């Protein structure tokens, strides 16, 4: 079969297209999924670059987000049939291994993928396999961060940094569905216009203005007595954006984070932390319940995942370049 392997740590030259990669066979309690689409995520790029303290067996077919149809059933599999449309939950939950599909075992950048049947989620007929493939790492993460961990409710003011990437766009869409007033930050006029089309209430081009100044102009400077600022800042950027995020929060506000793409060594101003009684809430990954809820939102016509481009498997390196050069709005998919 055709597959793209990450053969070593380094730049995009470590990606190899194979046309003779062995077809997988299902083990006990496994199925073979004929991959319709797989999403490209920064996790794939981090896997290729190498992550300190995390050993990845190489070569490996990455691609954690994938959806398709069941092509074969292993022994012991019940409740599923060949041809069933499925989304794969990438986090291995069978108790046998720790890690993710596309990390500790081959993933979706191939025509076929072997996965434990316990990882399967049925895709409603109203949902395209492309939309399903866009969900786990971006929309699943955003759902858990905003709803399960962040407790965002209607009427709250939510500032989203890095709002044009996969997780950021998902946060804007879900916060709007929750009834929040959303301020979305991005780095170009084109991305700002697309965020407006997603119904972001306010937008900030942070190459032209500081987001903390924009927030204070919109809602006023936070006051110890209450008022001003936003209720929630979604910040998975990290780096030097952390203290400015604190400066945006109203009394009792909270920062939600699921990562730190600009750097893990954060500077926190403890004065804002105690004076404004701020919360800093971490969120890690997603749940199967959240993925099912997202599929139901799509089926009901309430959510449409933002898919920027769909490229053939042969253009995997270009897909990763688009992410690395920040030329993507939402998600990029590969078609094996």
Where are these regions (language model features)?
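Glycine-rich beta-strand-centered segment in the early N-terminal region that forms part
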Residues: 22-38, 51-92, 124-126
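Residue-level marker of beta-strand positions
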Residues: 65, 84-85, 112, 157, ...
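N-terminal Rossmann-like NAD(P) cofactor-binding module of classical short-chain dehydrogenase/reductase
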Residues: 87, 233-234
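Glycine-rich phosphate-binding loop and adjacent beta-alpha segment
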Residues: 178, 186, 236-306, 336
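Short amphipathic alpha-helix with an adjacent loop that forms part of the alpha/beta core around
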Residues: 211-227
């Amino acid at each position: 079969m055709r597959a793209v392997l990450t053969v070593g740590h380094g730049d995009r030259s470590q990606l190899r297209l194979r046309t003779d990669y062995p077809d997988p066979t299902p083990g006990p309690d496994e199925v073979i999924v004929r991959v319709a689409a797989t999403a490209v995520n920064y996790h794939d790029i981090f896997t290729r670059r190498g992550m300190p303290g995390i050993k990845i067996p190489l070569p490996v077919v990455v691609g954690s987000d994938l959806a398709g149809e069941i092509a074969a059933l292993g022994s012991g599999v019940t409740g599923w049939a060949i041809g069933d449309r499925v989304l794969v939950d990438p986090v291995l939950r069978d108790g046998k291994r720790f890690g993710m599909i596309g990390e500790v075992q081959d993933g979706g950048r191939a025509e076929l993928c072997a996965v434990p049947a316990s990882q399967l989620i049925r895709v409603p007929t109203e949902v395209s396999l492309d939309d399903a493939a866009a969900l786990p790492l971006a929309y699943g993460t955003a759902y858990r961060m905003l709803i399960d961990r962040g407790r965002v409710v209607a009427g709250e003011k939510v500032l989203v940094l890095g709002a044009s990437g996969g997780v950021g766009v998902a946060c804007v869409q879900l916060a709007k569905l929750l009834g929040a007033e959303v301020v979305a930050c991005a780095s170009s006029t084109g991305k700002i216009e697309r965020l407006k089309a997603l119904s972001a209430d306010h937008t900030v081009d942070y190459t032209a203005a500081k987001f903390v100044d924009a927030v204070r102009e919109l809602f006023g400077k936070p006051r110890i007595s209450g008022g001003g600022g936003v209720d929630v800042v979604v910040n998975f950027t990290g780096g030097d954006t952390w203290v400015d995020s604190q400066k945006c929060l109203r009394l009792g506000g909270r920062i939600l984070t699921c990562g730190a793409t600009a750097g893990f060594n954060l500077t926190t101003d403890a004065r804002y932390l105690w004076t404004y009684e701020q919360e800093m809430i971490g969120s890690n990954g997603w749940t199967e319940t959240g993925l099912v809820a997202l599929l139901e939102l799509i089926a009901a016509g309430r959510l449409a995942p933002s898919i920027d481009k769909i490229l053939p498997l042969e253009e995997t390196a270009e897909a990763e370049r688009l992410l690395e050069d920040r030329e993507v709005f939402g998600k990029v998919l590969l078609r094996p």
